[in-house]
Amino acid sequence: MHAAAGRYREARHSLRTPASAQSRRGLDWMNFFIADVQTGFGTFVAFYLAESGWSQGQIGVALSAAGIAGMISQIPGGAIADAITWKRGLAAIGILITGVSALLLGLAPNFILVFFAQILQGLTAGIITPAIGAISLGLVGRSAIALRAGRNYRYAAAGHALTAALMGAAGTYLWNGAIFFCAAALCIPALIALGFIRGDEIDYARARNATRSNNRVATGRVADLFKNHKLVLFTAATLLFQLADASILPVMGENLVAAKYDQAAIWMSGLIIVPQVVVAFLAPWVGFHSEKRGRRPLLLIGFGLEPVRAVLLAFTSAYPLLVVGQIMSGITGAVIGVLTILVIADLTAGTGRFNLAVGVVGTMSGIAASLSTSATGFLFQAFGPRIGYLPLAAIAAAATGLIWLFVSETKPEKYED
């Protein structure tokens, strides 16, 4: 890891405008505080609604509302992130919307409030994700983005683990709605951390993955991205992965409630925390070794573990083995989370359409996640976990096969920032 840190410093100092320690730390801690606020309390929604007497089908519909909103928002959000210089302002808007959605969820498990809050939370996917990607790339450039992405995911995972524990404790020892008031409160330090990132250090051309001669504001067209066959194939693989993966943890939460575990919120927190601890340890390693050994070998590991995890969960409900499944989830999360940004950066180099491409991939993933949570909710309700998990394993295996057969190495021999 000392070697990785050395490579990161060397790459950073090679940039035209190296980012200050203040900006780097601000980005670190924004990732820490926003990670669980943006995605983690979404996992608690399934548990919260199940405790409130909602059926699996109703919960699936509620979760799908967030997925559909996220799907709609990501392409325009990515295009906006490419077009504007106000990257920090875009992130701030997303954080504020997330806080409002958390407060609405905490008020009452009323269908209209829950549905509206889920839509608001989903919309932030098209704002916060491209904003963080643009800020990161703008601060460090492509020559250091692998290690910066690993650092982003390390802080995000550590924040996810800690705040999931706090939110689980709030739900157990106060009341279930306290989970969401805790999530809303975490938006405040996220905004403070964002304020430490210096706007004058975010290089506009780098933030869009544009060349210096292509530094004008250009409207990215989705049609142009679909001419990039390798990007299309990678997007298809991530779509299949999300179709298999997105519903697994919410279903595990519902099953904990059905099994009538004492203090189920704490047990659910454990299942959320375990993969985040794994991601926190592995993400910098993934970033470093993706530079040393390339993206493809790590992608095959990340995608290949998902069908194994689904098969394991199909044949056991013992809590220790659920933890094993979540360790696998942490490995896949570290690999795919870090490498998705890197592969997109590789494949859009010089186009100025990096954030639009992130939005397109995110939209496809959002479609898959939305279909997964709604369809599997009814599937598990009708046939139970054993039958429900096996189709997910088959879909994950298909995603792995697509990477194996059609997605070659994307890492360039030399970077041009």
Walk through the language-model features, giving the residues of each.
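Juxtamembrane intracellular "pre-TM" segments in multi-pass secondary transporters
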Residues: 4-24, 201-234
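A membrane-interface helix-boundary motif in multi-pass transporters
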Residues: 171-185, 378-396
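Paired small-residue
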Residues: 112-120, 320-329
